[in-house]
Amino acid sequence: MSVDPRFTQALLDDEAVAGARVLTSLAGRPDALVVLGSGLAEALDEAWGAPVATVALGDIPGVVAPVADGHGGELRAYETRRGVVLVATGRTHLYEGLGPRPVTALARAAVAAGISRAVLTNANGCLKTGISVTSWRSSTM
């Protein structure tokens, strides 16, 4: 089996640094990563309460702060009955023109931090008229 030449040692080193930053910023080894779509962060806070730690996504090496409407710029740690869950309140999209590396940086940092489970959400519209992507809330459905 050959190694894909795009996966250079520098790329792997970047992920190790980013993973270490995630672990030191959020005080411990997380069990899972959830990446939220537009407007979903408030619903999560209603369900799980305040996070135990927060770091700006842009402070993690290689991760670009989200700019899309409805996307937040935080990585939050929540204590749940099943362990620590990291929640990104937004993400960078490929259509923003930055290329695949910044788009996948958070996922690669999560793997380097020891996370083996992830959920990627999307709030791409609604069948109910009058609900925009950025105004979605669980109480309006």
Enumerate the predicted regions with their spans.
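Metabolite-binding pocket within alpha/beta catalytic cores that recognizes anionic/polar moieties
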Residues: S2-M141
